[in-house]
Amino acid sequence: MKFVTYTRVEGTEPRFGYLRNDFIIDILYAAIYINENHGNSEYLSIPTSLTRALENWDGSFEKLKNLDRSLPNTLIHTYSVHGKPIAVSSDSVQFFPPVPEPKTFRDFYAFEQHVKIARKNRGLKMNPVWYDLPVFYFSNPTALFGHNDNVPYPEPTQALD
């Protein structure tokens, strides 16, 4: 499952969902739908943000997988609860970072080809220790952007990594 934080209308509160094909399933609306149409309230306790779901991930993830199994497999975008669709096209939303305000952000130096090229550009050979020791640095947790967001950068910038 690929989890997302999104909004359908700019300026509204972020919502917690996940991708299924080309649609985003809204977890809260889906839980209400299952409760009202199938009498199953267990999914109403799923947290309404990925940040909160991560606090008890084992329990949350099991419920999220079961929620998905409980939903119709076809025409998911035609189902609604209280006039709100339980699924919307992924093209019709604004994405936030999946965890909108992480407490910390570690950027791992983990892609071999990237590391090799960066070292070669500095006249260095690949260090064999890199294969045994994960290397990371702390980065700015407020500098995260959602899918398709415009990332601000200084005017003379010609390329982004």
Question: Which residues does each PLM region occupy?
Answer:
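N-terminal non-catalytic cap/leader segment that marks the start of a structured domain
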Residues: 1-135
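Non-heme Fe(II) oxygenase catalytic core, chiefly the N-lobe of the double-stranded beta-helix
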Residues: 131, 139-161
